């Protein structure tokens, strides 16, 4: 058993393969216990602060339900719910909350902010998403892949298609390197990850028997994949000119039925962190259709709704994996 007590969870790069595997195995155990109705509460009497500078469905619900299942109490501080960054620095907020709470989750913009919270609060801090990283998401992604494919992690061929610089792509590449996977990042050259992160991940992968390939060649990149993963192309709030340029760059990289077939693997699955623009059933989806004439963006609705799509199992697993992180770092 790995001792992660009082550790913060800021990036997967802070953890060894054994530690990440321990969290994934614990996630499986906690999920089984919940389904069997025999879950033991390890967080009784704990108070947890959830700081959200960005709105959220899955991350917030996962942290809240996981905490409640384990007997903890939570306080939600939304985008307008605290003074952090406005009247009070992250350093000061950390020291205030650290005196009242046993653990802190942060979902926001800056990786530096979550690092400051961890440095000055004196309690475990968990990264629920920053512009650079999304480590809790990757635990759910990997757990889902193992459940469906029934393969050990190091045998999974994992492929991300789309914007190679975004936080999910960064986090997946880190996680795959640590777990010794074959990881392909398929994206336009203009959207390649930073050399610094890529080189570091390649070094880690080599030590763990994994391999990382970055390519703009879709056929080469998806061949042999067990998992095809994508994420939204543009973040909300980015100007129209960014949307236009990004859509033009990434339209060839939309995950379609043809792309899934190019894997040559009939058992290949589709993953997405959600939300997804796969139809026009949302306000944003309708705006995309009106402005750009598209009824789907990063993934075809045909794939999203197919039997190969495991996105809702993946979403549920956010709760089980986040619960594992909290229990491992804060549990009695």
From Swiss-Prot:
Keywords: Amino-acid biosynthesis, Arginine biosynthesis, Cytoplasm, Transferase. The keyword Hydrolase does not apply. Its EC number is 2.1.3.3. L-ornithine binds at residues 167, 231, 235-236. Gene3D superfamilies: Aspartate/ornithine carbamoyltransferase. It catalyses: carbamoyl phosphate + L-ornithine = L-citrulline + phosphate + H(+). It comes from the Bacteria. Carbamoyl phosphate binds at residues 56-59, 83, 107, 134-137, 273-274, 318. GO terms for molecular function: amino acid binding; ornithine carbamoyltransferase activity. The keyword Protein biosynthesis does not apply. GO terms for biological process: arginine biosynthetic process via ornithine; citrulline biosynthetic process; L-arginine biosynthetic process. SUPFAM superfamilies: Aspartate/ornithine carbamoyltransferase. GO terms for cellular component: cytoplasm. It is found in: Cytoplasm. Pathway: Amino-acid biosynthesis; L-arginine biosynthesis; L-arginine from L-ornithine and carbamoyl phosphate: step 1/3. Reversibly catalyzes the transfer of the carbamoyl group from carbamoyl phosphate (CP) to the N(epsilon) atom of ornithine (ORN) to produce L-citrulline. Belongs to the aspartate/ornithine carbamoyltransferase superfamily. OTCase family. This is Ornithine carbamoyltransferase. It comes from Staphylococcus haemolyticus (strain JCSC1435).
């Amino acid at each position: 058993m790995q001792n992660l007590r009082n550790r913060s969870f800021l990036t997967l790069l802070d953890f060894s393969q054994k530690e990440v595997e321990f969290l994934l195995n614990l996630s499986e155990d906690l999920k089984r216990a919940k389904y069997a109705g025999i879950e033991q509460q390890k967080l009784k009497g704990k108070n947890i602060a959830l700081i959200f500078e960005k709105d959220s469905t899955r991350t917030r619900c996962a942290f809240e339900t996981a905490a409640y299942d384990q007997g903890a109490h939570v306080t939600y501080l939304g985008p307008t719910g605290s003074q952090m960054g406005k009247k009070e620095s992250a350093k000061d907020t950390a020291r205030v909350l650290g005196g009242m709470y046993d653990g802190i989750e942060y979902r926001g913009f800056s990786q530096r902010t979550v690092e400051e919270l961890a440095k000055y609060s004196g309690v475990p801090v968990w990264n629920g998403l920053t512009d650079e990283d999304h480590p809790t998401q990757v635990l759910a992604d990997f757990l889902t892949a193992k459940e469906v494919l029934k393969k050990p992690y190091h045998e999974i061929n994992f492929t991300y298609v789309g914007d190679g610089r975004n936080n999910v792509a960064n986090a997946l590449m880190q996680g795959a390197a640590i777990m010794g996977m074959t990881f392909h990042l398929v994206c336009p050259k203009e959207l390649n990850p930073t050399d610094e992160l890529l080189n570091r991940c390649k070094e880690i992968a080599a030590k763990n028997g994994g391999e990382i390939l970055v390519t703009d060649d879709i056929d080469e990149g998806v061949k042999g994949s067990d998992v095809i993963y994508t994420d939204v192309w543009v973040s909300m709030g980015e100007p129209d000119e960014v949307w236009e340029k990004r859509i033009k760059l990434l339209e060839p990289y939309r995950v379609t039925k043809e792309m899934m077939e190019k894997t040559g693997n009939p058992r290949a699955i589709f993953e997405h962190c959600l939300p997804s623009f796969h139809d026009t059933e949302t306000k944003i989806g309708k705006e995309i259709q009106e402005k750009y004439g598209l009824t789907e963006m990063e993934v075809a609705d045909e794939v999203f709704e197919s039997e190969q799509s495991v996105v809702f199992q993946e979403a549920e697993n956010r709760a089980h994996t986040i619960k594992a992180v909290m229990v491992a770092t804060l549990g009695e």
